[in-house]
Amino acid sequence: MARRSRGEDQDELHCQDTDSDVPEQRDGRCKVKWTQEEDEQLKMLVRHYGQNDWKFLASHFPNRSDQQCQYRWLRVLNPDLVKGPWTKEEDQKVIELVKKYGTKQWTLIAKHLKGRLGKQCRERWHNHLNPEVKKSSWTEEEDRIIFEAHKVLGNRWAEIAKLLPGRTDNAVKNHWNSTIKRKVDTGGFLNETKESQPLYLLVEVDDNESQSGTRAESQTIVPNWPVDISEIKEEDVSDEEVTGLQELPSELPAADLAEHNEEGTPDDVVPEDASASVASPYKWVVEAANYLCPTSVPALNEALDMIESDPDGWCDLTQFDLPEEPSAGSSSSSNSPVRQTPSKPTPSLPNVTEYRLDGHTISDLSKSRKGELIPISPHAEVSFGTPPSVLKRQKKRKISLSPVTENAPSTSLSFLDSCNSMTPKSTPVKTLPFSPSQFLNFWTKQDTLELENPSLTSTPVCSQKVIVTTPLHRDKTPLLQKNSAFVTPDQKYVVDNTPHTPTPFKNALEKYGPIRPLPQTPHLEEDLKEVLRSEAGIELIIEDDVKPHKQKRKQGLRRSPIKKVRKSLALDIVDEDMTQNMPALPKTICFKRTQPVNFLSRSLNLSSSNRKNDSGLLNRAFVQVQSEKMSYRKMPSHFRPPAPMTRAWKAVACGGTQDQLFMQEKARQFLGTLKQSHTSRTLILS
């Protein structure tokens, strides 16, 4: 993205709900949010007095300046502003105006677009209309660059976007928040392996000096101990800047060095023999692991491997106790982890001067400007003998260095100001190598026991085996869960529903202690069959006339099948006549199962029996056992229509007796005394 100059578009400041972005606010003016009353008052004043005298308009606001009032009107309240989406005509107009005026005159461009601000035109161009903006999908390499740069720079998206040609800061920010951040939180980048990269010599060659074919002995900057640099991806480098491994030419004028010193670089950047030696170029070699390591030293490689294995253990370099004046004879120290490093130069480089990168020097790079050199202490010879104290501690940590870029007109190594921070500005957070869900989904033995024997205040979630009991009988069936975890059912359970004890009943029953199982009460069909068979010698045959209507249940409510008492039964008495060859059998009553309706809305139809005596079996209030022998005749193929029930049976069945009426009246009086303090809850037992 193009960098805006300081004096460009002074009237392009974006006015939001606050005035904190208005420059040079003085006179004790507040920077608080504009209220709706202030907006309405400003609109009224502008309509009455116009936009010529903003100081007069600001005098009506005790805590607002004329700039605040003007910016509020021009950027927010002006009815001529267009804040909607851009049309194709507007986009085409912006492209034509950019070709005509360039990418700096946004105020002039905005004057040709009615209702648009210069800031809107600028953002529209840089984020959407610029042909250099990439709109393709993000690659893994770009994700890695954003990940590494974010560790160093944080949320400085404009600086990170400079490392990705063709990507805007807005696109980088959106991609981080939508994709990369989630991948980092889940540890997606931890398992990826680092690909090996070739060595690059990051130097600048002057155009005039590059024509000379003379080459001289070079000085190589070698750290005494491994300086850990965070992984920074290389930018796209042109062919004329870096081509393979290059060396500086033989002549490096002293005037160039003096020029760099005038720019703010310390004098100790130049070695002591720089003035005497004419040929003293510098060579930087960036290895695949991004360390300043021009030579292949076994001990140094060992140290680098140790750093790679435990990057989070390294602490800040500014806290290291580094020796300032290492002795020349310390190269033979026995306790040095890099004592095997040869102190004499290699045959190919006879005059090699080694420089040590001090931790404080590296930290000072964050305060330097673009184009400055790295300050190096002017020691003629630095030994590898004395190891730093951090290597003795065997607790290492990576720190970040800014990536290196090149300046064409100068012969120096420059660092991008986008990567100036040497140490993290906030407490580093170590990414967890595991998922917290592993602990959340882990069940202990106690949890299993609690699920198998839930307390009175808990409601079972799902059950595979259910015992049909009364509401006061607790289900002791253990819960069988899939993979020892609650699984949301993916199907709707219609009739198979487990009875749930309502919470108010649970709370009321807790005071009476544990619930003991009670004998089965005759409210189920099986119990009715057994009672009628044993007491009256009647066999019940239940037939379904209409299939039960499937009710839709919410997903997650799993209930086991339970048979409820039928609210409406049609009693059909089977003919007593049986074949003479069959023995005496108990009488059979056929119950036809009908659709569930209100118990009091329908009358019970009783079928009359074709007995020898005229008195029906159910014409009285109670069932009596008949002692007479049944005749052996064939059962008729069809049943006679049932006779209407008598008044005596209707009084007993429908609650018309004196004791039933008395209990109903008492119940109404009791319910009438209750206070309706809260909304009653509907109790669904089906």
Curated annotation (Swiss-Prot):
Report, as the record phrases it, the tissue specificity of this protein: Expressed in hematopoietic and non hematopoietic cells.
InterPro entries noted in UniProt: C-myb_C, Homeodomain-like_sf, Myb_dom, MYB_TF, SANT/Myb
Q: Where is this region: Disordered?
A: 1-28, 315-355, 493-512
Spell out the subcellular localization from the entry: Nucleus
Q: Tell me the GO BP annotations in alphabetical order.
A: mitotic cell cycle; positive regulation of transcription by RNA polymerase II
The record's listing under PROSITE patterns reads: HTH_MYB
GO cellular component terms listed in the entry, alphabetical order: nucleus
Residue ranges spanning the membrane: these are none
What binding partners and quaternary form does the record give? Component of the DREAM complex.
The protein's name = Myb-related protein B
Source taxonomy: Eukaryota, Metazoa, Chordata, Craniata, Vertebrata
